[in-house]
């Protein structure tokens, strides 16, 4: 007969994996080996997608800011450059939210950026 090696620890480890695999299709939720493979893959995807989520949101914010800038007759890159010249410390998340929810406020920021590009000396910090 085979020797049993530390059964309580093994059982706990396997139960933990099967608990994580709950809701998976077919044998991936009941058989330890396939469940373990699937859980490891799922955790890798989760790790990868937490990083990608940040990139995706930044892309979304940039496209929203660009759409708002185009509506006001400006480009995204010029808007960001003008806002940095004017020492405006708003991040892209806030700018995208303003472009959607407060178009008049966003338009005033576009005008500020246009003015900062036209008269950079006016906004120089001395």
UniProtKB/Swiss-Prot annotation:
InterPro entries: Ribosomal_bL20, Ribosomal_protein_bL20_C
The UniProt record lists the keyword rRNA-binding: yes
Domain of life: Bacteria
UniProt keywords, alphabetically: Ribonucleoprotein, Ribosomal protein, RNA-binding, rRNA-binding
Similarity field: Belongs to the bacterial ribosomal protein bL20 family.
PANTHER family reported for this sequence: 39S RIBOSOMAL PROTEIN L20
Protein name: Large ribosomal subunit protein bL20
Encoding gene, per UniProt annotation: rplT
């Amino acid at each position: 007969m085979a020797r049993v090696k530390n059964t309580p620890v093994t059982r706990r480890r396997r139960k933990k994996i099967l608990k994580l695999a709950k809701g998976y299709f077919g044998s991936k939720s009941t058989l330890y080996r396939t469940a373990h493979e699937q859980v490891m893959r799922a955790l890798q995807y989760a790790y990868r997608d937490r990083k990608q989520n940040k990139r995706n949101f930044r892309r979304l914010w940039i496209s929203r800011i660009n759409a708002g800038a185009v509506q006001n007759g400006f480009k995204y890159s010029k808007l960001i450059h003008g806002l940095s010249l004017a020492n405006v410390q708003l991040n892209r998340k806030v700018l995208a939210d303003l472009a959607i929810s407060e178009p008049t406020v966003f338009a005033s920021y576009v005008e500020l950026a246009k003015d900062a590009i036209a008269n950079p000396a006016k906004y120089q910090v001395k």
